[in-house]
From Swiss-Prot:
EC top class named in words: lyase
Name recorded for this polypeptide: Argininosuccinate lyase
InterPro entries: Arg_succ_lyase_C, Argininosuccinate_lyase, Fumarase/histidase_N, Fumarate_lyase_CS, Fumarate_lyase_fam, Fumarate_lyase_N, L-Aspartase-like
Organism taxonomic ancestry: Bacteria, Pseudomonadati, Pseudomonadota, Gammaproteobacteria, Pseudomonadales
Enzyme Commission designation: 4.3.2.1
Main subcellular localisation: cytoplasm
Gene of this entry: argH
Gene3D superfamilies: Fumarase/aspartase (C-terminal domain), Fumarase/aspartase (Central domain), Fumarase/aspartase (N-terminal domain)
Organism: Stutzerimonas stutzeri (strain A1501)
Amino acid sequence: MSTDKTNQSWGGRFSEPVDAFVARFTASVEFDKRLYRHDIMGSIAHATMLAKAGVLTDAERDQIIANLKDIQSEIEAGTFDWRVDLEDVHMNIEARLTDRIGIVGKKLHTGRSRNDQVATDIRLWLRDEIDVILGEITRLQQGLLGLAEAEADTIMPGFTHLQTAQPVTFGHHLLAWFEMLSRDYERLVDCRKRTNRMPLGSAALAGTTYPIQREITCELLGFEAISGNSLDGVSDRDFAIEFCAAASVAMMHLSRFSEELVLWTSAQFQFIDLPDRFCTGSSIMPQKKNPDVPELVRGKTGRVFGALTGLLALMKGQPLAYNKDNQEDKEPLFDAADTLRDSLRAFADMVPAIKPKREIMREAALRGFSTATDLADYLVRKGLPFRDCHEIVGHAVKYGVQTGKDLAEMTLDELRQFSGEIGDDVFAVLTLEGSVNARDHIGGTAPAQVRAAVKRGQALLAGR
C-alpha cells in the first residue's frame, strides 16, 4: 500500500508520508464505501449548482456528471478499486474521477469540504434507510391485522406478572403490538423530518466564499430545508442519535414480542406453532425445534441499544465544529439501521405464518381464576361497594384453590356461601365468552371491538 503524501488531497502541508499503520488506522473506506451512491448523488447536485453559479462551464459539468455515473456503474459491477491510502469513500471517488478526466475532476470539490460532504451523505443515506424501515413496519402491521382479524374470537389468558389475569382474545393481544409499531412508525417519520435538512454548502465550518446557491442543491437532493448554521451543519449528529433512539424503542418492542413468542412456543405454554422455516434444530437433541428468529431479534436488540449509547458517548465531549471522532459515527449507525430493518423483515415474514393452538389457549384461560374480576364487577352491579366485592371474591378464590375448582366450576350454593347477592345469572358472567364480550368499548377485548380496531388499522395503513 502506498503512503506517498502526493496521494493525499491535503499532502501539500506535509513533508513526509503518513505512517503505514496510521494510514490504515485512520482510513474509513472499508465501512463508509456503502455511502457511494449518496456521495455521487451529492456530487452531481453540487456540480450542477457550480455550473449555475458560473464556477464550472456547462461542458465541465456534463463531463463530471457523466463520469460520476460511470464510476457508480464500476462500483456496482464490482470493478472499482477501493484504496485504503485514499482514506474514505469521498476521496476514492474523487481520485477516480480525476484519473478519468484530469484537471476538470479536481474542480468538483470547489466550495465544498469533506465535512459538509459526509454530513450530507449520511443524511441522504439515512433518509433512504428510514423509508425502507417504514415499509417493513407497515408490512409487519399488515400481517398483524390479518392474524388479529382471523383470531378475533380466539380466547387466551391475559397476563400480569406472567400470572393469569383476565381472559382476552388473541386478536386483541396482537393488536397491542400493532399500536406499539404505529408509534414506532410515527417516531421514525418525525426523525426523518429532522434528518432531511441539507448541510451541503457549510463547507469546512464557516461556509464558502464562492457564490453558491444552496437552494439549487437542496431541491435537487430532495431535502426539505437548508441547515441554518454552518457550524451546526457539519458538526452535529443528533439526527443519527435520534434515529438510534427511535430504533431502540422499536427493537425493544420487537424484543418483548419475541419473548412472548419464545414462551408461547415452549412445551410449557404450547399456545402457538411457528413454521419450520423460521426455526432450527439441535446438533445433539433430535426433538428440538428452536424459535431462533425471535431469540435472535431479542438478542440483537442489545446491539441497537449499544449504538445509541455509543453515539451519545461519541458526541458528548466534542467542541465545535468537526472532529475526527465523528468518523466513528457510521458503524454504529449502519449497524443499528441494518439490525432494525432485518429484524422487522424477519417478523413481517413470520407473523402471518403463526399457527395458534386455540384449544390449548382456551384451556389455559379456564385455569387461574381469570374471571375473578368479572365476579367482583357482577357484585358491584348488585349494589355492593367494589372493595367489599374484591374481598368476597378473594375468599371465593381461596376456596377454589383449596378445593381445586375454578369459579365457573363451583355450584350456586358454593358461590352463595360468600355472598347472598349471587344468583343464577352469575354463570353467564363467569364464562370466558361472557368476560371478553362484556368489555365492549373502544380499546376493549370484545371480538366486535377487535374487528372494529382492525378496520381502523387498515384505514391507517391505507392512508400512509
